[in-house]
Amino acid sequence: MAELKNDRYLRALLKQPVDRTPVWMMRQAGRYLPEYKATRAEAGDFMSLCKNQDLACEVTLQPLRRYDLDAAILFSDILTVPDAMGLGLYFETGEGPRFERPTDTIDSIKKLCIPDPEDELGYVMRAVSTIRRELKGEVPLIGFSGSPWTLATYMVEGGSSKAFEKIKKMAYEEPATLHMLLDKLADSVTLYLNAQVANGAQSLMIFDSWGGALSHHAYREFSLRYMQKIVDGLTRHADGRQVPVTLFTKGGGLWLESMAETGCDALGLDWTVDIGDARRRVGHKVALQGNMDPSVLYGTPERIHQEVDQILSSYGEGTGHVFNLGHGIHQHVDPERAGSFINSVHELSAKYHK
């Protein structure tokens, strides 16, 4: 593997000194880029794009050609794990992801097998190794997975949900059944992420997109508990370096202290949290990633500049901050505005690292 030339992102996650705040964007390889749309059209559909290692590599690299970013993130989907469990993932226009065979009974959950990441998920591993090779050490590669709770919401509901009625019914009516599912998912995700590291991922992120839908105590029982299990089982060193782990619960501002106790290296923040307040609460334990509202990218370059300045000022001096959006970039954002965002981070952050 080529020697890493830019380790700013990894250093910030480990709270080591950096010359400026590193920056990347969630969903940086995505529909806001015309070159992504062209490659997706070539693939035919979303999952065909994910399953073609060369095209997955191409879309991973596309934002790096446009912008001076400090990390690449594997192009894939959080639902690859349940798909590999045999649920029959498909995408319905205007409806998002759906499963042909939801796991909404104890019998269906008992039948689930833990997928072999080098077999049923081998296409992801081939993409990881291809991307790592083609990056040529320019920036580190982030591997990722959905959290057990978030994956379970799709599996039990049969797809996207706003009310989470089925899975919450299971949580309170048949908690042992849900725990059985979450336990299998935690084991599956641990194997999946460790295989990503073995194939070249240099940092890991767990996306808990729907943890914020839970009550205070239910979050600890059904989400955090299983992310903790994963963190405990992850490979934390590879290629002579530490492999940092970031946890991101959308809507998780209430639980930063509990999340920081898991032993992860960093927490992702959504835009509802003041990053300076988050630093005062947990900055002694973990680095922080975030957290500009993605909708700010619809604003003028001047407004974007102002928002970046405010977040940097709130965090203050020193390392331990990776600049990002508070969630994925919207598909209708002008790529020029994303460029304004990244340039503003470069321009404004150096003074906080002298």
Swiss-Prot record:
SUPFAM superfamilies: UROD/MetE-like
UniProt pathway: Porphyrin-containing compound metabolism; protoporphyrin-IX biosynthesis; coproporphyrinogen-III from 5-aminolevulinate: step 4/4
Protein task: Catalyzes the decarboxylation of four acetate groups of uroporphyrinogen-III to yield coproporphyrinogen-III.
Protein name: Uroporphyrinogen decarboxylase
A Pfam entry, by short name: URO-D
PANTHER family, A to Z: METHYLTETRAHYDROFOLATE:HOMOCYSTEINE METHYLTRANSFERASE RELATED, UROPORPHYRINOGEN DECARBOXYLASE
Gene3D superfamilies reported for this sequence: 3.20.20.210
Predominant subcellular localization, coarse grouping: cytoplasm
Annotated gene: hemE
GO CC, any one term: cytosol
Site positions per UniProt: Transition state stabilizer: 77
